[in-house]
Design a protein with these regions (language model features):
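Adenine nucleotide-associated cytosolic modules
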Residues: 1-132
Length: 132
């Protein structure tokens, strides 16, 4: 989940973390709700129209917590990404190759993260070569 949060922050997203703990690196960069998830975290988003600008990325240690959040998000039509279960992902995070204003995203549709990472590294190298 840390890689996903770093990527979202790099593109200017505002991140809220709901967790009893958060790593030091993120404390200054995110809004941290120091608590365990409960349904009221979604209720505070308002109606589905307002919630449509939100996504949820899950990385709880307990699979049952992730499954509960997936279920709650889907009831409100909020896109969700369960980092521990690709079958519970409404979207996937691409590998990113970035050079200046050029950004390329590579995904394997959740199937082969290593392949996507290798291709991302190759594209980064190509971008560096072109930029020279």
């Amino acid at each position: 989940a840390m890689r996903r949060v770093r990527t979202l922050l790099e593109f200017g997203c505002e991140i809220t973390v709901v967790s009893p703990e958060v790593c030091e690196e993120l404390r200054e960069k995110v809004l941290w709700k120091k608590k365990r998830y409960d349904e009221t975290d979604l209720e505070s988003l308002g109606n589905v129209g307002e919630a449509s600008r939100f996504i949820f990325v899950l990385a709880a240690a307990a699979p049952e917590v992730n499954e509960k959040i997936v279920c709650d998000c889907r009831k409100k039509k909020i896109p969700v990404n369960n980092a521990s279960n690709r079958d519970q992902c409404d979207f996937y995070f691409p590998g990113i190759a970035k050079d200046g204003d050029t950004v390329v995203g590579i995904t394997s549709g959740g199937g082969d993260h290593r392949l996507a990472a290798k291709i991302s590294a190759a594209v980064r190298q190509i971008l560096r070569t072109i930029a020279v």
